[in-house]
Each structure stands twice: as C-alpha cells, then as structure tokens.
Amino acid sequence: MENYRQIDLSAWTKFGEGGNGVTYVSLDEPDVILKINKPGLCTLEFVKHEYDVSKAVERLGIPVPKVYEIVRVGDDYATISERVKSKKSLSRICCDEPALTEAMAEVLCEHGKKLFSAQCDTQIFPSRKAQLTRALEKVRFISKKNRRILKEFARTIEDKTTCVHGDFQTGNIIRSGESYFWIDLDRFGYGDPMFDIGHLFLICNVYAPMKQVQDIFHMGEAQLRSFWVAFARAYTGEEDCSAFDHLAGKFACLDIVLRYEFQKPSLAEKLFFAFHISHLIKRYYLG
C-alpha cells in the first residue's frame, strides 16, 4: 500500500469552505492549498478519484488548478493543489457585486461553450447517458408511467463525446485575474451539454426558493432566477428563451434522477427527489 505524507493540521490555517469540504493554507507552503473533504468524502477511494479526474481533465487542456499529491490528515485523506491567488467564484462575485450578475452569466456561458466543445477521453470518463440509463433503474417512489416517460425521452438523447462538468454552476468556476478555472470535477464525463445546463436550471429555478441553496450560492431567489435568464439569453442568442427553458426543465428532471448514480440517497432524499421529479414531469413532459 502506498505511503502518503502525513500533514500536521496545526501548521495550517482555514482558508475557505465549499460544498465538498474545507481548504487550508500554510506559511511554510504558500503556493499550495490543502483540501479536506467533508465526512464521507475523505476516503482514499473518493480522494484518489478526485485526484485522477483532475489530472485527466488537465491533460484535455481544460483550465483547472493543478493537483500535486494525495496526503493524510489524521485518518482522513486529502489533496495538495495549486493555490490560485486572488480567486473568486462567480457565486461570490455575484454576491459582492450584484450589478455584475448578467456579466457573470455571460462568462459562465462563454466558458461553458468552450467546455462543451472539447472532445472528452471516452476511455477514462463515463458517458452521462449511460449513467442516466442505470439511474433510471434505481430511482424510487415514482410511478411506472413516469419512469416510462423518462426512459422514452432518455432514448432520444444523443450520446455525444464532448465534455460535461457534472456540477455546472456558479460556485465551480473561479476567476483569478483574467483567467478562469473549473473546480470540483468528480462528476466529469461526456454527453449532451443539456445535462449540465439542466443542472444549472434546477439550481436557479426549481431549488431557488430554498434557503439552503441561497446560502450555498450566496444569492437570493430573485438573483438566481435573473442569473438563469441572462445565461439562457447568452447561450441561445435570443430574447425569447421559452423553448430552451422547456428543454432545460426536462433535463433538470433527469439531473435529479442522476443523483442515484452519484450518491446513495437517504430515505428523506429519495422522497424529496421523487416529489420534484413528479412536479417536473407534469410541467415539462406532460404540460
């Protein structure tokens, strides 16, 4: 078994906190950050997956912070990565300067389109459509009719071989000077870009009224919805985005189904997912 360097956390200072974990900096190693995932995500299996994915994405030419090594912090596993100086996520920029919301939506659109046009390594990364096919067999508390509706739509999706992020949202692209970097790549894969866009739609519209979501993204409901409107207009080049919104709503439903591929939902989460799946099917598949 490989020996990993043991880190003394007392020599490090907490630097930031995100959805997956906490980052630390050290005066002794000023050009790197230590990232410790939250409980359940600090196993060697998960951290090595993050490490391997980051290295593979970098080889594709996608702008990401360099990851250097896997380390131990007590019994947990963590990573040492490049410290991107003076960084801010699009979420934080929108929070600090609400007047830039539309501009940041255009930034996400621009860099999203670059990502979606990049050819992925299909020998390393998973097909999002294949993941969806598996997840549709796992999803619970939905009717046979609704499962059939989703399967029929899933069969129409082209299995594209271009990149998708997997957690495409304002917190996962950071700015440093004039440069932008993608972060949190553990769900990276290939497929139709609408998988990523549906995820963004889910956050900015369906989940926007939730206080927990607002806290994560540092934006209130109205600002999240405004971000989506600006993104949709930038992405389509049109003022009337109703058809695009409708398609994104369909993929938002599939994004919830995909949770069964990416995690092991609790009973409460399964019921939460089922409620929103049913609501989205009524609105975007049957409406």
Residue map of PLM features:
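ATP-binding glycine-rich loop module of kinase domains
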Residues: G21-V47
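ATP-binding glycine-rich phosphate-binding loop
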Residues: Y4-L27
